[in-house]
Amino acid sequence: MTKTLAEQPGEGAAPVSPSPSRRALLHGAAGLGALAAGAAVAGPGLAFAAPAGLPLPPATPGITPFKIAVPQSALTDLKRRLGATRWPERETVEDWSQGVPLAKLQGLVEYWRTRYDWRRAEATLNRFPNYRTQLDGLGIHFLHARSKHENALPILLTHGWPGSVIEFLKLIPLLTDPTAHGGKAEDAFHVILPSLPGFGFSDKPTQKGWNMARIAKAWAELMQRLGYTHWVAQGGDWGAGVTTALAHLQPAGLAGIHLNFPLVFPEKLPTTDLSPEEQRALAQAQAFNTHGSGYFLLQTTRPQTVGYALADSPSGQAAWIYEKFQGWTDNKGDPESALSQDEMLDNISLYWLTDTAASSARIYWENAGSNFSGGKLDLPVGVSVFPRELFRAPKRWAEQTYSKLIYWNEPDRGGHFAAFEQPALFAHELRECFRQLRAK
């Protein structure tokens, strides 16, 4: 996910110029993010399968426990589809510049078909308390893991695209039980981890309007409903946008936020006397707009069209996400050096089994033209900039946007999926950032 590296382009947007303006830079980076076969719907001489997806229980304003249980028929159908994949010819280059190499995807798909075990992932998810509740008319899924330690600080974590709650599963025990993982009891957190609307086990919006600001309002209501009166929030990718919108909303009890994808730019881009960090940031933005924004433009302008292809082909869905694990993680050339095949397939399988290719892509369309940073922010903000992040904002730019920048660090490893790639390091960043915001 996340937004563009400036304002998002509309239809017919002009190509990025060699000397990018702030508008052009900002404009390419947001993503700098069947089940039971249904009854056929008869048409004139045609029959179409009903939309796939898990049958989710209706949500109510109450907090309802939820257990994940994918029907076996969905897993059988997945393996059948994987075995029937129609492959294109191989790429004409020896790298990833044309997309996922054929041999790499075939290897991942064969592992998915013959060796991968969704039930293991399902059991891991169910190890934590899962719930659903209705927020602004939509059923929202969330994990809520409370710490055993007194005075633990509630933290609201928000994922992005193509991520999910699965990104944070290794992080949860590090936050809730720090004494078991080299930390101190006073560093404990209660973890609240929702699935964005249209993602995972949350409902899919049936009407437009679910942009970052609306999601932020729903998250504020969730924290109030859970009874928290002093809490913090964290996000990367689209989660950074939602968390920033939450900070601008300043709901009761929100003490501060942490971001690992601060998409901030100065009001006026300087043309001379750029620091090395500023030169690097501008080069990153231009490179993304030129070489890495194809998915972003598609999902910003035609999420429904993309959805038809991905909803019908698990191999296509895998390629769409696997490519991002290669390009956006701190790896040695192959994504498997940053994340295991099982870890990547846990996330890919969640998208496939919940049939959320189109609904998750719509977050780009919903936020076209939005200001990702939302302007000046007065709430306390902490930032961790990981070395293989899509865009590494200079501290000077962050200071111009965040008047209360309470924490800034640039760890030595990790990428866009930092919590997934480096959970222990990510936990350390959160402990350090929020230590000063804990209730006395």
UniProtKB/Swiss-Prot annotation:
Catalyzed reaction equations: an epoxide + H2O = an ethanediol
EC number: 3.3.2.10
PROSITE patterns assigned: TAT
Keyword NADP: no
Signal peptide: 1-49
GO BP term, pick one: epoxide metabolic process
Chain intervals for the UniProt region annotation (Disordered): 1-21
GO molecular function: epoxide hydrolase activity
Annotated transmembrane regions: none
Post-translational changes noted in the entry: Predicted to be exported by the Tat system. The position of the signal peptide cleavage has not been experimentally proven.
Keywords (A to Z) from UniProt: Aromatic hydrocarbons catabolism, Hydrolase, Signal
Family assignment from sequence similarity: Belongs to the peptidase S33 family.
The protein's name in its UniProt record: Putative epoxide hydrolase
